[in-house]
Amino acid sequence: MNSLSDKIKFVYYRIIFAIRELPVRIKRLLIHLIWIVPYDFKYKQHEIIKTGAEWLFGIPFYIIDVIFLPEIYEITMEMFKWNTRFLTHRELELARSVFGNSILPELVRIDNRSVSGPKQGRFAYVSFQTINCYGHMSDRILIHELVHVWQFLQFGSIYIPKAILAQRSKEGYNYFRTAGLMNMKLRNGRLYHFNFEQQGDIVMDYFNMKQVNDDQAIIESEVYEYFMEDIKSMRIFS
């Protein structure tokens, strides 16, 4: 159970965060709205239609951010869910060791008694900056879910459909480990070229490797470091 003071602190943090984040959210929406499909005869018609549909589908999610729906949702749920908690000191240190200053771990909440979904399906999910699960959550799963928090901070609520589409894609969570990373690096690809669930597993596997003290893990982690630069260099507020 959380104290009332924790609830009040949570609401205060969310309001301050939303106000500070608003200019960035407006900028995201405007950039998205002025995007125009570049008509070029080298593009096939079905590709233009698909890209245009994705553009239209994304508009509501950018609007959701501007009208503070993520914060309204989290504050409302916080009033009804007394199992949510802030990260422990140990969890805060783990988060900072992986993400640096690219997330705000002191704002993250965990509900490890989330009945709707996690209890039946034994899975975790992220609603903006709240991690929902049922029972104990391992460190590796915590890191994976924190990637979705990071995605929300960097890209907005659009992370939700992108993560769902990633789960249903042919690749799913599979990024083909070191070989897949090397191939992407050779093509000058970055972390955002992977789908939103692959990103979570890449960071999670990097975290796992850092816990193992053997030569093979050290060698393999070098290519992961290249993509981890994207995690630690991206903004919280601009």
What function would you assign to each model-found segment?
Residues 106-120:
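Mature, structured domains enriched in cysteine- and short glycine motifs
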Residues 72-74:
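Protein maturation boundaries and topogenic segments
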Residues 32, 36, 44, 54-59, ...:
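Short loop/turn hinge sites at secondary-structure boundaries
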Residues 1-61, 66-67:
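N-terminal low-structure segments adjacent to metalloprotease catalytic domains
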Residues 146-166:
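Catalytic Zn2+-binding segment of zinc metalloproteases
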Residues 83-86, 101, 118-145, 153-156, ...:
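Short pre-active-site segment immediately N-terminal to the catalytic Zn-binding motif
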Residues 2, 10-17, 21, 25, ...:
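Metalloprotease/metallohydrolase-associated module, dominated by Zn2+-dependent proteases
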Residues 69, 104, 139:
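Active-site surface patch of divalent metal-dependent phosphodiester/phosphate bond hydrolases
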